[in-house]
Amino acid sequence: MGAIDTETKAYLSNPEHFCDVFNFWLYKGRQVICVDDLKELDTTAIALPYGVDAKEPIQKFRDVLKLYTAMQDNRAIYLMLGIEAQTETHYAMPVRNMLYDAMSYTKQIAEAAVSYRKGEEKLPKAEYLSGFRREDRLMPVITLTISFSPEPWDGSTSLHEMLAVDDNEILQYVADYKLNLLTPHDIADEDFDKFRSEFGTVLECVKHRQDDDMKWMEGKERFKGVTRQTASLIKTVTGFNLDLSEEGDVVNMVNAWENGLNKARNDARAEGRNECRRDMMTAIRMIKENKPTKVIREQTGLSEQNLIELRSML
């Protein structure tokens, strides 16, 4: 797993950030899902193969998966919420997420079957073979893909879009799977205010990653003090040359940006001076070896006037 994958997964595993993502996606920023309503779930999913030729089980690992419990009309409502982070377009994402969701449903049925077989109640034959009772219900699974690219998602967003047929008479009999997709490119600048955690700040930086200046950052209070973890993630996923040497747990993004640019300019000047010095030393050595002027110029990039001045000094 790469550095970006590791860092984004750790950041999204934070319950505060996780809640913020789904409150934005499901409720347009309304604070419905709370940290206390979440429970960590095992991100490992195993799908048992079917058929006589079946061999090894399929094992997949989700990025983040949590159980959401809420009360609605005096009864408990359960949702399984999963997040998949992508730094680039995954052109098979609808099938990939469909598999994750199917394995989550399969696991629920398998767990129900185990509990019934351990229980004392004798089930009717059909329910016993199914491992599932007629009145049983599954917990819904919602998987959200989050893009960390400033570019628009140019892949399929549904299973039907991936199929090699566009005949509606056929497609109406083919089950579809729609991708839940959150991309910074498609978020209006004013909608980043709907995020209550710093995750919105991360996505806004991703959206403007290719901008030539920082005007989009000016005048926004949230950029004046972000946690070091958030600043580090922004630097990782955007490639911004941020200077995070400032002490303390809070980073002023505007200062970090400006200091990073100044440091880059100074480093470039220093490197330019060092490179010029190296070229001069090479030219002096080649002059002493009586190398032709044309060869010296080609290797060092120095002008003919530079070489005349060097020769006069030797």
Residue spans of the language-model regions?
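Accessory alpha/beta interaction modules
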Residues: 1-193
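Short, charged alpha-helical interaction segments and adjacent helix-coil junctions
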Residues: 77-87, 182, 197-314
